[in-house]
Amino acid sequence: MFVILLCRIIIQSYKMNTVIEQTIQFKGTSASALFDIFLDPKKHSRIHGGAVAKITRIEGDKFSVLDGNLNGKNLLIVPDRMIVQSWRGNVWEENDLDSILTLVFSNTKTGAQIYLTHSCTPKQFKELWRKVYWDPIKEFLAEQD
């Protein structure tokens, strides 16, 4: 049984072996404000055009965002500094491993930045981050001015 499980894990690691690393700059905002967008259900919902977001700031809590299309668990929360979560899309195959997302927030001279590492994820997620998160967050912040 162990050998079968190990083989499945190896196969899945080849299928979803992409590691995405991105550093995104946001002008005129703070690390704290960016952190809030990810873990405040109302703000998270707003950046996605009202899609339901059930999320908390509590380590160990499960979450569901994008109208239930993305689910996971808060693995580590360092207020205003870091979020580590497991992620699973509702279209992933049953045997697919959960991906691990790490977001590190920091202030810069002109605003703030997010350093993202997303491991064990489908390749198409790289471009989806810009479309689904970075561009909508920038639009949301512009509306706040």
Regions found by a protein language model. Give the residues of each.
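A solvent-exposed, acidic/Ser-Thr-rich amphipathic alpha-helical stretch
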Residues: 51-61, 65-66
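Hydrophobic-ligand binding "helix-grip"
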Residues: 64, 68-113, 118-121
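Hydrophobic pocket/interface hotspot
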Residues: 34-35, 44, 63, 74, ...
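Charge-dense, helix-prone N-terminal extensions
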Residues: 19, 26, 59-61, 73, ...
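Hydrophobic ligand-binding cavity/cleft-lining segments
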Residues: 9-54
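A conserved amphipathic terminal alpha-helix motif
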Residues: 119-145
